[in-house]
From Swiss-Prot:
One of its GO terms (cellular component) is membrane. Gene3D superfamilies: Immunoglobulins. It comes from Homo sapiens (Human). Interacts with HSPE; the interaction, inhibited by heparin, promotes the generation of activated factor X and activates coagulation in the presence of activated factor VII. Initiates blood coagulation by forming a complex with circulating factor VII or VIIa. The [TF:VIIa] complex activates factors IX or X by specific limited proteolysis. TF plays a role in normal hemostasis by initiating the cell-surface assembly and propagation of the coagulation protease cascade. The gene is F3. Disulfide bonds join C81-C89, C218-C241. Glycans are attached at N156, N169. Residues 275-295 are cytoplasmic. This is Tissue factor. Coiled coil: none annotated.
Length: 295
């Protein structure tokens, strides 16, 4: 008859070893969970107009913060927006130093309140941005029609350049200053009474176009860099019309006329009042100086 097998009682040294092993496992799990709670940034996107440049990313932080670094291909990394809870970082001051360079940025993720913590590879989680060349990729800002003047059957239209955040000798440069002849303007113009548009192009800031005498025209302009493959065109400028300008002068004329009319009325009223006062004063004086009748 076989003796029943009883559960084995562990020896003291075996129990200690198992306890130590279990503690080590818990420590690893806790460390791993701390790392897992820090999420790497994603969807890094450059947003740039007239060289005002902001890097955006996701996700909104939960118990974590971000730091951004930027570099040229041959340069050193520079840290910006330290330990921020924002999901964007303004990098304009770096990229305007040389807008023809190609830049790369990266976003580091840190646990909130423990920025010294690193990932499993011995460094914080991070994600790289796409490469960005401002001269080739920044969006062109909306231009403005500065003025237009008609002489006979010719109209001279002048475009006002947008200012950029690129500086030279402590002066902000215009789009024309930065892009030179790479920048052209396209003018769209049409009769106020018609929807048919005509176009004209120039690599300066002025247009001289032929128009029909006696007709009012409307204008809109667009900035274009033909050599680009992306972001070639700006949005159209606000529409300006010749009739609107005449209407403004007419409105000013009416206002001035109304003011003059009111002033004339006030002068007349004042003159009548003064005349009545003088007449009343003369009558009173005559009565006072008249001799009394003695009966």
């Amino acid at each position: 008859m076989e003796t029943p097998a009883w559960p084995r009682v562990p020896r003291p040294e075996t129990a200690v070893a198992r306890t130590l092993l279990l503690g080590w496992v818990f420590a690893q799990v806790a460390g791993a969970s701390g790392t897992t709670n820090t999420v790497a940034a994603y969807n890094l996107t450059w947003k740039s107009t007239n060289f005002k440049t902001i890097l955006e990313w996701e996700p909104k932080p939960v118990n974590q913060v971000y730091t951004v670094q930027i570099s040229t291909k041959s340069g050193d990394w520079k840290s910006k927006c330290f330990y921020t809870t924002d999901t964007e970082c303004d990098l304009t001051d770096e990229i305007v130093k040389d807008v023809k360079q190609t830049y790369l940025a990266r976003v580091f993720s840190y646990p909130a309140g423990n920025v010294e913590s690193t990932g499993s590879a011995g460094e914080p989680l991070y994600e790289n941005s796409p490469e960005f060349t401002p001269y080739l990729e920044t969006n062109l800002g909306q231009p403005t029609i500065q003025s237009f003047e008609q002489v006979g059957t010719k109209v001279n239209v002048t475009v006002e350049d947008e200012r950029t955040l690129v500086r030279r000798n402590n002066t902000f440069l215009s789009l024309r200053d930065v892009f030179g002849k790479d920048l052209i303007y396209t003018l769209y113009y049409w009769k106020s009474s018609s929807s048919g548009k005509k176009t004209a192009k120039t690599n300066t800031n002025e247009f001289l176009i032929d128009v029909d005498k006696g007709e009012n025209y409307c204008f809109s302009v667009q900035a274009v860099i033909p050599s680009r493959t992306v972001n070639r065109k700006s949005t159209d400028s606000p529409v300006e019309c010749m009739g609107q300008e005449k209407g403004e002068f007419r409105e000013i004329f009416y206002i001035i006329g109304a003011v003059v009319f009111v002033v004339i009325i006030l002068v007349i009223i004042l003159a009548i009042s003064l005349h009545k006062c003088r007449k009343a004063g003369v009558g009173q004086s005559w009565k006072e100086n008249s001799p009394l009748n003695v009966s």
